[in-house]
Design a protein with these regions (language model features):
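Beta-lactam-recognizing serine transpeptidase/beta-lactamase-like catalytic domain environment
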Residues: 1, 6-189
Length: 189
């Protein structure tokens, strides 16, 4: 469900969503004749974007994801470091996966709206590591700076002498408007 934040940010930044965008959740969403359920049976009623984040409403994000589009969701997710190794330097780090909506190999079905629906709640082809999600959420909290994660701050001798110390290392800035970060942070509280 934390991936829903990427959909919200992508929607706000692209103009596909506003804080006042409302969708109704009766507990399910139909795309054609395929039913996608919410986690809450009976639904959440009508919610704006903040309410959808607070309640983690699947039905809201199914519809928001279709409006935002898969390309924008993936673009914003990559900007936050999803789909790449976090850079811990501990060997075999998980890269994770983000969907590639480009046409698939011959004989395989192409990308569908149903794929976009399930991606919008972080399922389907979305694979992330806990460290990637920590990097993403810390960037939201600090206004968009992606820092290289560390698991060790300082190495000290038994005597207490500092042998090595690691300072925060900014990797890049996520190009998101301050008001978008402020809105998302407030909704997360």
């Amino acid at each position: 469900s934390i991936f829903k934040l990427m959909v919200a940010i992508a929607g706000l930044e692209s103009g596909a969503l506003t804080p006042d965008t409302k969708y109704h959740s009766p507990g399910y969403f139909y795309l054609g004749n395929v039913r996608f359920d919410d986690w809450k049976k009976g639904g959440h009623g009508t919610l704006d974007l903040r309410g959808a984040i607070v309640n983690s409403c699947n039905v809201y994000f199914y519809q928001a994801g279709l409006k935002v589009g898969i390309e924008e969701m993936v673009r914003v997710s990559r900007a936050f470091g999803l789909g790449e190794t976090p850079g811990l330097g501990l060997g075999d780090e998980a890269r994770g996966n983000l969907p590639n909506p480009q046409p698939r190999r011959r004989g395989q079905p192409g990308w569908s709206a149903g794929n976009t629906v399930i991606t919008s709640i972080g399922q389907g082809l979305v694979v992330t590591s806990p460290m990637q999600l920590l990097v993403m959420v810390s960037a939201i909290a600090n206004g968009g700076t992606i820092y290289r994660p560390w698991v060790v701050k300082k190495i000290a001798a038994l005597s207490g002498e500092t042998l090595d110390e690691y300072e925060p290392e900014a990797i890049r800035q996520v190009p998101i408007k301050p008001e978008t970060f402020a809105f998302i942070r407030q909704a997360m509280l």
